């Protein structure tokens, strides 16, 4: 009977070690991706890694809680040999995490109770909880239950209700300023509030607000002036421009006014 239990315990430990090794490999792979491939890592890939690690942890928990699993809690581990010297075989088995199995390391690795500091804090919290009266504790429990109920009710509400409330709030809240809108309409329609300033540029005399046209010679004027340059001696005076005639361009071209009966070869 004892040999059978020992074999079951060994088989259980081998299965547990294999599953822990798989979990360890998944963690190492995920940490490597986070440290070296973070620029190419996508959020769906991160979720897949988390799902894989969570599934492996759930499998280990199911294995430990299974009724057919031998009672490993009744097993006691006793250190048979303690040495302050470095143990290469132990370092190899623990991947150089525990190179020495000495008196300082054994309490940390084989402890079945919390640290003394943690145990003292637990005792202090237990004493504070014992000092609270039943009525005060009941009131605190009711307040906490009410808070949790309200939170669960908000979380369980349909999404449509939340969307309708949000749309109602948006409709009730104005999205514009009426004063600014009225000022803009008055400025565009009636020129209210606009400053009275003239556009840049010279203004023709007698017509304020109307810019004077450019008086530079055009291409046609330059051509005519070049063609009639040899008749400058035969040209007559140019009639001066009358002021107050808008749109009339003063010309520098000398015109040749002749009689209809005049001919250059008449003797």
Swiss-Prot record:
GO terms for biological process: protein ubiquitination; regulation of transcription by RNA polymerase II. Residues 166-180 have a biased composition (Polar residues). Residues 2-27, 118-163 form a coiled coil. Residues 156-165 have a biased composition (Basic and acidic residues). GO terms for cellular component: core mediator complex; mediator complex. It comes from the Eukaryota. Residues 156-180, 227-267 are annotated as: Disordered. One of its GO terms (molecular function) is transcription coregulator activity. Residues 236-247 have a biased composition (Low complexity). It is found in: Nucleus. Disulfide bonds: none annotated. The keyword Magnesium does not apply. The keyword Aminoacyl-tRNA synthetase does not apply. InterPro entries: Mediatior_Med8_fun/met. Pfam families: Med8 (PF10232). Pathway: Protein modification; protein ubiquitination. Keywords: Activator, Coiled coil, Nucleus, Transcription, Transcription regulation, Ubl conjugation pathway. Component of the Mediator complex. May be part of a multisubunit E3 ubiquitin-protein ligase complex. Belongs to the Mediator complex subunit 8 family. Component of the Mediator complex, a coactivator involved in the regulated transcription of nearly all RNA polymerase II-dependent genes. Mediator functions as a bridge to convey information from gene-specific regulatory proteins to the basal RNA polymerase II transcription machinery. Mediator is recruited to promoters by direct interactions with regulatory proteins and serves as a scaffold for the assembly of a functional preinitiation complex with RNA polymerase II and the general transcription factors. This is Mediator of RNA polymerase II transcription subunit 8. The lineage of its organism: Eukaryota, Metazoa, Chordata, Craniata, Vertebrata. The gene is med8.
């Amino acid at each position: 009977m004892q040999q059978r239990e020992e074999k079951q315990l060994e088989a259980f430990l081998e299965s547990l070690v294999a599953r822990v090794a798989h979990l360890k490999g998944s963690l190492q792979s995920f940490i490597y991706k986070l440290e070296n491939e973070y620029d190419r890592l996508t959020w769906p890939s991160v979720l897949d890694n988390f799902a894989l690690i969570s599934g492996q942890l759930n499998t280990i928990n199911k294995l430990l809680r299974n009724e057919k699993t031998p009672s490993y809690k009744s097993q006691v581990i006793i250190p048979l040999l303690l040495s302050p010297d470095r143990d290469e075989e132990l370092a190899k088995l623990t991947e150089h995490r525990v190179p020495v199995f000495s008196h300082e390391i054994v309490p940390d690795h084989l402890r079945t109770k919390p640290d003394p500091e943690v145990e003292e804090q637990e005792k202090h919290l237990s004493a504070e909880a014992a000092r609270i009266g039943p009525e005060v504790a009941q009131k605190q429990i009711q307040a906490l239950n009410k808070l949790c109920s309200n939170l669960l009710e908000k979380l369980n509400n349909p999404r449509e209700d939340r969307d309708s409330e949000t749309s109602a709030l948006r409709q009730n809240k104005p999205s514009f300023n009426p004063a600014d809108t009225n000022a803009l309409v008055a400025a565009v329609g009636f020129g209210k509030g606009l400053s009275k300033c003239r556009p840049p540029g010279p203004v023709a005399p007698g017509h304020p607000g109307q810019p004077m046209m450019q008086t530079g010679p055009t291409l046609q004027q330059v051509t005519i002036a070049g063609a009639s340059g040899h008749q400058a001696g035969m040209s007559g005076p140019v009639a001066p421009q009358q002021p107050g005639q808008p749109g009339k361009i003063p010309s520098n071209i000398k015109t040749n006014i002749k009689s209809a009966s005049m001919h250059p070869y008449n003797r």
